């Protein structure tokens, strides 16, 4: 039995939830998100509280109910407050610059990298070595951050590359003769 599915999702002020069969739509101040719920899971809305229960008492039903509850909670948090991920660029000459829906990166390659941002994502560059990715969809924000990091992941010898702001890179010692 999922402990996550047992706790309900409380709706903050300004957030609306519409349940239409297996579709759940969440609307808030920052935007709106939709999610298709699995047929083994039932979602109900009563007095500003969304509760998730499986149709049957199977292990798979409870697992899917827990996953659905976590996804709905992330949707509610996203439309109310939004999500953000911070990246740092470490390395000589590594720079980032946001221009509209394109993130221009100089990462030590012979060419600049132009990353096209998906719909619903905004990027700020407070300094040339910092990137802040914002959006209402937690999965999309994390995926964009992972895509940008994948251009030049931090290497273990000098620590150069693109890393998350809270990431600790394990350093290795160079081979000695």
UniProtKB/Swiss-Prot annotation:
Record's GO cellular component terms? cytosolic large ribosomal subunit
Pfam families per UniProt: Ribosomal_L6
Biological process annotations from GO:
cytoplasmic translation
Coiled coil start-end: none
- The domain of life is Bacteria
Q: Name one GO molecular function term.
A: rRNA binding
User: Mind telling me which InterPro entries this protein's record contains?
Assistant: Ribosomal_uL6-like, Ribosomal_uL6-like_a/b-dom_sf, Ribosomal_uL6_a/b-dom, Ribosomal_uL6_bac-type, Ribosomal_uL6_CS
Keywords, A to Z?
Answer: Ribonucleoprotein, Ribosomal protein, RNA-binding, rRNA-binding
Extract the SUPFAM superfamilies matched here. Answer: Ribosomal protein L6
Region entry Disordered: which residue ranges? 154-177
Instruction: Show the ranges annotated as biased composition (Basic and acidic residues).
Output: 155-171
Q: Read off the HAMAP family from this record.
A: Ribosomal_uL6_B (MF_01365_B)
Which NCBIfam families does its entry note? Answer: L6_bact
Q: How does it assemble?
A: Part of the 50S ribosomal subunit.
Per the entry, what this protein does is: This protein binds to the 23S rRNA, and is important in its secondary structure. It is located near the subunit interface in the base of the L7/L12 stalk, and near the tRNA binding site of the peptidyltransferase center.
Q: Which family does it belong to?
A: Belongs to the universal ribosomal protein uL6 family.
- Record protein name field: Large ribosomal subunit protein uL6
Species this chain originates from: Alcanivorax borkumensis (strain ATCC 700651 / DSM 11573 / NCIMB 13689 / SK2)
């Amino acid at each position: 039995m999922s402990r996550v599915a047992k706790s309900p999702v409380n709706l903050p002020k300004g957030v609306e939830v519409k349940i239409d069969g297996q579709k759940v739509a969440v609307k808030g101040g920052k935007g709106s998100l939709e999610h298709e719920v699995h047929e083994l899971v039932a979602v109900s809305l009563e007095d500003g509280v969304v509760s998730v229960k499986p149709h049957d008492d199977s292990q798979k039903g409870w697992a899917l109910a827990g996953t659905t509850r976590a996804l709905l909670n992330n949707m509610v948090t996203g439309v109310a407050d939004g999500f953000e991920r911070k990246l740092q660029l470490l390395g000589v000459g590594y720079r980032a610059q946001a221009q509209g829906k394109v993130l221009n990166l100089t990462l030590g390659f012979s060419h600049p990298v132009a990353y096209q941002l998906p719909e619903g994502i905004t990027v700020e560059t407070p300094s040339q070595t910092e990137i802040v990715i914002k959006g209402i969809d937690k999965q999309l924000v994390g995926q964009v951050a992972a895509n940008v990091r994948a251009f030049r992941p931090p290497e273990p010898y000098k620590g150069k590359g693109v890393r998350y702001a809270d990431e600790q890179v394990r350093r290795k010692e160079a081979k000695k003769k």
